Amino acid sequence: MNTPKELRYSKEHEWVRVEGDKVRIGITDFAQSELGDIVFVELPEVGTEITANEPFGSVESVKTVSELYAPISGTIVEVNESLNDNPEYVNESPYEKAWMIVIEPKDLSEVDNLLTAEQYAAMVNEG
């Protein structure tokens, strides 16, 4: 399982990368491996307000549909449109090509409440 150390993680298996005053969000390698082959990604539009721990979109795999949960609150400023035509990026490159959204956070310090890579790996391994 790939768990980059520089990212923060939610208990719902989303990752967060702080990029200046913005935050990029996607799903973890563990999540994509559990879901199986991703066939569709549904994401909100730019300008949508998201709230921490609330659903903001979904991913559909050959096995199931899973909601995406916002790890922190903010306003969406960018959506990864390439996932419309290439949902397989979620399986192939969950931390690079398959980021889901970029937000302008309401409070960047919310990131501090998320799990470190070590904490996330421990949670997943306890399963």
UniProtKB/Swiss-Prot annotation:
Domain called Lipoyl-binding: residue spans: 22-104
The family database entries (Gene3D superfamilies) matched by this protein are listed as: 2.40.50.100
The cofactors it requires, by name, are: (R)-lipoate
Its domain of life? Bacteria
Q: Which family does it belong to?
A: Belongs to the GcvH family.
- Name the NCBIfam families on file: gcvH (TIGR00527), PRK01202.1 (NF002270)
What's the protein name?
Glycine cleavage system H protein
The protein's organism comes out as Geobacillus thermodenitrificans (strain NG80-2)
| Gene responsible for this protein | gcvH
